[in-house]
A protein has these predicted regions:
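Small-residue helix-packing motif on alpha-helices
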Residues: 63, 73, 97, 113, ...
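Rossmann-like NAD(P)(H) cofactor-binding subdomain of soluble oxidoreductases
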Residues: 64, 70, 75, 80, ...
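Internal alpha-helical scaffold of NAD(P)-dependent oxidoreductase catalytic cores
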Residues: 84, 142-163, 177-217, 230-267, ...
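Glycine/serine-rich anion-binding loops at beta->alpha junctions
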Residues: 168-174, 219-229
């Protein structure tokens, strides 16, 4: 399925365009520039061609970024300056952004979702549109309850509602290395909608589709995961510094070692087999691994993901002090 001919591009609005919203917009707009360059290059009769990526029927061509503060607007203007012709930045005017949009990306803080969506004008402006939420801990049903007072599973195209989709990208979106989890929808999205949502998030990294019941664990693993990995990276770099390596080189070496390891795993190597391959009898690797096992690093890291999963489930409920005590 290719992009339709003519001036039929979609308008994408980001409500609450912070760090993640900027990263997603940047990835999408950079990709659109690449597509235009590829089209221009393919017009040349010389050289060889490679199979083109299958595109959604319609792609975004106009963009709105909605923020509350002037400082946020200035930041977007600087970071997305090369895309200025197709981007409109709105301060304190969410309603216009939603009215202009075909697709709305909801990127505000989870506790603000009620204030942003809970009025009749926004509800009317969203009618028949696609609303993609990247809010941690906020299920589709909660958003539908805010908008409509219930979470009916009727086909929105039959009752004038917007279609709500939940996705969980992570901070690596900034370097287009996100791991995004998209919740499957009931009833399923139409083929054009599904293609568009998947395309949007593959602009910033990898994508998997999982049931809604997996989203809190996905938030913990993928959303919180970069912080967990950064702590491990920092710890091994600290150990190297303690043994005499310069800080900058130790951090670079640790980061590249982690990157290389993930490359092997993404290439199909099982972590346990990889670990065993490096652990020669009587060597330094097995000695270090046993220290990690004695320190229950495996169980502690697993518990961190479990704890973050439980906390993630509370984020959209307005619960205060969710990290004040351990959930049982």
């Amino acid at each position: 399925m290719g992009q339709s001919n003519g001036d039929s591009g979609l308008t994408l609005t980001v409500l609450g365009c912070g760090t993640m919203g900027i990263a997603i917009l940047s990835g999408i707009m950079d990709s659109l520039s690449d597509i235009r360059s590829s089209v221009s290059a393919s017009a040349s009769p010389s050289g060889t061609s490679t199979p083109a990526e299958e595109l959604p029927q319609r792609l975004p061509s106009r963009f709105f970024a909605c923020v509350r503060r002037h400082e946020s607007a200035k930041r977007i203007k600087v970071e997305l300056s090369k895309h200025a012709p197709s981007l409109t930045i709105l301060e304190g005017d969410n309603l216009r952004g939603v009215r202009e949009a075909d697709v709305v990306l909801l990127g505000c803080k989870p506790q603000m979702v009620g204030d942003i969506l809970g009025n009749d004008d926004i509800r009317e402006a969203l009618k028949g549109k696609l609303l993609v939420s990247i809010l941690a801990g906020v299920p589709v049903e909660q958003i539908e309850n805010i908008l409509y007072g219930d979470s009916s599973f009727e086909d929105p195209s039959q009752n004038g509602r917007c279609r709500v989709v939940r996705a969980m990208p992570n901070t690596a979106s900034k370097v287009r290395e996100s791991m995004t989890v998209i919740a499957t929808s009931t009833p399923p999205l139409s083929a054009p909608q599904s293609s568009l949502v998947t395309w949007m998030f593959t602009r910033i990294g990898r994508v998997v589709h999982l049931p809604p019941s997996a989203m809190d664990a996905s938030t913990a693993l993928c959303g919180s995961g970069p912080a967990f990995m950064a702590l491990i990276l920092e710890a091994v770099a600290d150990g190297a510094v303690a043994m005499g390596l310069p800080r900058a080189e130790a951090q670079l070496m640790a980061a590249q070692t982690m990157r290389g390891t993930t490359g092997l795993v993404l290439g199909g190597e099982h972590p346990a087999i990889l670990r065993d391959k490096v652990s020669t009898p009587g060597g330094c690797t097995i000695g270090g691994l046993l220290v990690l096992e004695e320190g229950t690093v495996r169980g502690t890291m697993a518990r961190a993901v479990r704890e973050a999963t439980v906390v993630a489930s509370q984020l959209g409920k307005g619960v205060q002090g969710v990290n004040g005590t351990r959930f049982r």
